[in-house]
């Protein structure tokens, strides 16, 4: 009986972990902070920063895109790490 209960506990923990979805901030520049659940098995959040005629611009989201010269990017792997 104890073995059965222990087995069920382990299976429950493993199944709950398989449904995990990374959560990243996705607001742009000075917008109100918002978050989104990443899809497609994304394992990274990013924060991209660059300067244009309006000043510094910031973009946040899921993934870790490649960027052009002059654009600063920080990628991370934990929930809401890209604030």
From Swiss-Prot:
Q: Which Gene3D superfamilies match?
A: CD59
Localization per Swiss-Prot or TrEMBL: Secreted
Q: Which PROSITE patterns match?
A: SNAKE_TOXIN
Keywords of the record? Acetylcholine receptor inhibiting toxin, Disulfide bond, Ion channel impairing toxin, Neurotoxin, Postsynaptic neurotoxin, Secreted, Signal, Toxin
Residues annotated as signal peptide: 1-21
List membrane-spanning regions: none
Q: Please provide, alphabetically and separated by semicolons, the GO molecular function terms listed in this UniProt record.
A: acetylcholine receptor inhibitor activity; ion channel regulator activity; toxin activity
- Name the domain of life: Eukaryota
Cysteine pairs bridged by disulfides in the record: 24-45, 38-62, 64-75, 76-81
Which family is this protein grouped under?
Answer: Belongs to the three-finger toxin family. Short-chain subfamily. Type I alpha-neurotoxin sub-subfamily.
According to its UniProt entry, the function of this protein is described as:
Binds to muscle nicotinic acetylcholine receptor (nAChR) and inhibit acetylcholine from binding to the receptor, thereby impairing neuromuscular transmission.
Q: What is this protein called?
A: Alpha-neurotoxin NTX-3
User: Species name for this entry?
Assistant: Naja sputatrix
């Amino acid at each position: 009986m104890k073995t059965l209960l222990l087995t069920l506990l382990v299976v429950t923990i493993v199944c709950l972990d398989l449904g995990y979805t990374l959560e990243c901030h996705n607001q742009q520049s000075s917008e109100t902070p918002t978050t989104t659940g990443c899809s497609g098995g994304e394992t990274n959040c990013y924060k991209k920063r660059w300067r244009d005629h309006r000043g510094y611009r910031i973009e946040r989201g899921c993934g870790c895109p490649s960027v052009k010269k002059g654009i600063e990017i920080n990628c991370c792997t934990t929930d809401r790490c890209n604030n």
